[in-house]
Every structure is written in C-alpha cells, then in structure tokens.
Amino acid sequence: MYSFNTLRLYLWETIVFFSLAASKEAEAARSAPKPMSPSDFLDKLMGRTSGYDARIRPNFKGPPVNVSCNIFINSFGSIAETTMDYRVNIFLRQQWNDPRLAYNEYPDDSLDLDPSMLDSIWKPDLFFANEKGAHFHEITTDNKLLRISRNGNVLYSIRITLTLACPMDLKNFPMDVQTCIMQLESFGYTMNDLIFEWQEQGAVQVADGLTLPQFILKEEKDLRYCTKHYNTGKFTCIEARFHLERQMGYYLIQMYIPSLLIVILSWISFWINMDAAPARVGLGITTVLTMTTQSSGSRASLPKVSYVKAIDIWMAVCLLFVFSALLEYAAVNFVSRQHKELLRFRRKRRHHKSPMLNLFQEDEAGEGRFNFSAYGMGPACLQAKDGISVKGANNSNTTNPPPAPSKSPEEMRKLFIQRAKKIDKISRIGFPMAFLIFNMFYWIIYKIVRREDVHNQ
C-alpha cells in the first residue's frame, strides 16, 4: 500500500514538472520577436523610413565613388564604312559600394532585387561618349539586374544595343585594319565625385563563337583611360579599343578577280588579225566600258574621301591597261596603213616635178630663148635649195650621185605590215609583264609593308 502511494506521488510530480516546462516554452515562443519580412527589410533599408536619399551619392562630400565596369559582348556587327559606325549588343555591368545599403538584419549574403527598385537607389550617370544611337531591351521584361551585398556592394547590369561612331582610315581598303573604340564617361559628376575604372579581371568579355561577316575581332583589346577636360570640369572616362582585321575574300571575288579577267580579256586583241578592225575595236570598247562600270561599283559602298584607297589604285591601273590595249590597236592600224600615205605622197611629188622638167626642156630646145646651160645652170641648179646654184662652168662637169632605187608599193606595204605585227608581238609580252610587275609591287606594299606600319602604330 505504501509503495503504491509513493508511485502515485512520483507520477504526479512528473506530470506537473513537464506541464510547467511546456508552458514556459510556449510563453517564451510568444514573447520572441518575429523574423522581419523581405518587404519590411527593404523599407527599412531604402524606404522612406530609412532616411536613404537616391539623389545623394555615397560618401557625400567625401572621397569619390569608384565604379568598376565590365562589358560582355553578345554580338558585334553591322560595321558600315559609309556612315563610319558599328553596332554592338552588350551587357554593361557596374559595381560600386554604397555604405548606406550595408545590412546585418537579413540572413542572406546578397539580395537580387526587381529592376523597379533601381529608382530607389543612387546610380552612376554613365553614358557612351561616341554613341550615335541606343536602346534598352524589354522582352519579356526589363533586361536589368540589381544585386545588393551584405557589405553594401551594388551590382547593376543592363543589356543594351549601341550604334557607336568609328572613324576609319580606308587608305589600305580592302586590306585594312580598323580600330573601333567604346568610350564610357560620366555626364554630370566630376572626378571629385565619381571615378570609372575597368574591372581587374575580364574587363571585356566576348561571347563564345562570335564571328563577324567581313572582319576578324582580334583577341587583344586595349583598355585605356581617357579623362575629359571641359569648361565644366574634369570628368572620368574609360575606353575599350577593338582591333578589326578585314577579310578580303568578298572583295577578291567581287572586284579583284573580275577586273583581272577583264584586263586579260583585253589582251586577246593582240592575237586577233589587224585587219579585223570591228572585232578588235569592239573588244577594246567593251572591256573599257566594263572596267569603268566595275570601278564605279567598287566605290558605291564607300564614303567619299579625299585620299586614294588601295582599291582605287587597282581599278585605275586596270582601267589604264584596258584603255592602253585599245590605243595599241589604234597604233597598229595607223602603222599598217602608212604605206598608202607614203605612196600618195610620192604621187603628189612626181606630179609637182613633171611640169618643171618640161619647162626646162622647152627652154633649151626653143630658138631665141635664154639658155641656162651656157652659164652652167640647168634644172638641177634651179631646183637647188634656197636658190643656191651648183658651181662650175659646165653642168656636164658636175657629177650627181645615182638615185637610190625606190621600193615597189608591194614591198612598202609588207614593210609597214611587218612593223605593225611587231608592235602586236611586243604587246603580247610587254602588257602581261608590266601587269605582273605592278601586281608584285601592289601586293607587297599593301599586304606586307603597310600592314607592318599599322601593327607598329
């Protein structure tokens, strides 16, 4: 009986003990503070009750804000020589520290916020100095990222498409290497308030497999500082330089090879018979007109610049060779017809000599007429140049050299035709050799010498 009462007492004490412990835990749980919701935390961090003012930069009246920039290139293309600009799609990332946004109340080390929160914080006033046109991307939502870290670091990323100016030097076109720049500058804050700098690692990144239609984007990229001095102060500026080497495959197929074939086609005229005037003239005029059209087409996609380009020299020399081939036939035709002119000249000369000889003979045979022979003057003396007579008492004493035998018209014709054919034979070798020498100098200068000068710059 005694042991039963003792057991009941022990059980009662145990129940009371656990009941009191449970009630204390419940009371402690009710009295513990509730965890802060994300909305309450953001209101406390940057809301109206936080005292945060987005109009005031971090470290106001203190050291300047250092903004680290990084660019990721999604696409690079639409390089236009006529307007001298290029189009690029990038992720622009900016990082800076805002001590007012540091927190300890929230468990996460970083917060990825909605883009609408960007209006609630201070942001750098970055703009692209050489920008000609730009737009944001809003499909399917605003392509913007805002991330705040526990220590107050802010990451702001945005996707934009830019059309940037790119002054080009086209002297070596289409074997040129262009350098296009991208300048990032502060619009309103001077260097006393804001400083841009490139990220130490991977400041400019390029998407894998990025290719350009006519250019090769070189891996080395120059990152520079370009501080701007204006009347309103000294402003921070950084720039990236992209080196673009043109691939001339398109121009080789569309311009160089066709013009080369036209020049070679004009040389066929040297193998056509010189008597086939319609064929040779038609071929010459056709090649000249075709070369002129080809030259005009090469300039259609290029700006009107004051200097001479490599393609201009090529087209001008090709046109010169084609035109020279046409002039060569004019020379051949002229030389081949010279025997007719010479025969016509001889006939005229004989026609003028005959009346004079008849006159002298009549004077010598007629009675009572003055005889020049008595004074040693005959027709030969009268025909002497400048009226000077031959000395001697008697004309018979004067010895005249025998006249050179004149060639027959057929021999003269063959002589001049041989001269014309010789011009054709020389042209068959001379024109290709001259064009080959020009090609050697042209390609050596523009592919080796000029390229080394560009790389040295």
From Swiss-Prot:
GO molecular function term, any single one: glycine binding
Effect of residue 258 to S: In HKPX1; impairs expression at the cell membrane; requires much higher glycine levels for channel activation
Marked site positions, Important for obstruction of the ion pore in the closed conformation: 289
Classification via PROSITE patterns: NEUROTR_ION_CHANNEL
Binding site for Zn(2+): 220, 222, 243
Pfam family, one: Neur_chan_LBD
Annotated glycan sites: 66
Catalysed transformations (reactions): chloride(in) = chloride(out)
Domain-level remarks: The channel pore is formed by pentameric assembly of the second transmembrane domain from all five subunits. In the absence of the extracellular domain, the channel is in a constitutively open conformation. Channel opening is effected by an outward rotation of the transmembrane domains that increases the diameter of the pore.
Sequence similarity: Belongs to the ligand-gated ion channel (TC 1.A.9) family. Glycine receptor (TC 1.A.9.3) subfamily. GLRA1 sub-subfamily.
Official protein name in the record: Glycine receptor subunit alpha-1
